[in-house]
Amino acid sequence: MQARRLRNPKKTIDMATIYDYKALASNGKEIDFADFKGKVLLIINTASKCGFTPQFDGLEALNEKYRDRGLVCIGFPCNQFKEQDPGSDGEIEEFCRLNYGVTFQIMKKIDVNGPEAHPIFEYLKQQAPAEEYLGLKAKGAAALFKTISTSVEKPSDIKWNFTKFLISRDGTEIKRYAPTTEPKDFEKDIEAML
């Protein structure tokens, strides 16, 4: 079941920062990203039945280690890549908590690419387009992934589950990490932003 996405009054390209967006938590509560000003954000598109799902362990380790210093981790479940997150919002959140001890915020399931892509991910893709993936330039990676996922259309599109975005305290710096990048591999970037 596709979650309702919130509509912002402005188009994505007119948005100034990540703080102009809102999204729904898995319990249906509206989360206003303006509340995260002054925090370092780690936003991840997740899936519970993916080969990268064990990354929840590393993501939770970062969450536990740095949350008191200002890191906020937010997982957005997505079922666009080989339907690897088919459960309901409640089932997905329960899976994350029971199997990986996840304590960070899990949102309602969304699309990250295509006409129904959540505005937050449209903004993130615009601000931090992928330069390469698996050694391929973004255009080549998009062509490769289009063969396994119909949601990959543009070079900036999310290529797979567990693409990660790290956003600085003032929202002006956004770094993008490929699904193959383990959480421990960008810990230094988190420390630098904190």
Cite the ranges covered by each PLM segment.
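Short loop/turn microsegments at loop-to-beta-strand junctions
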Residues: I18-Y19, L41, N161-T163
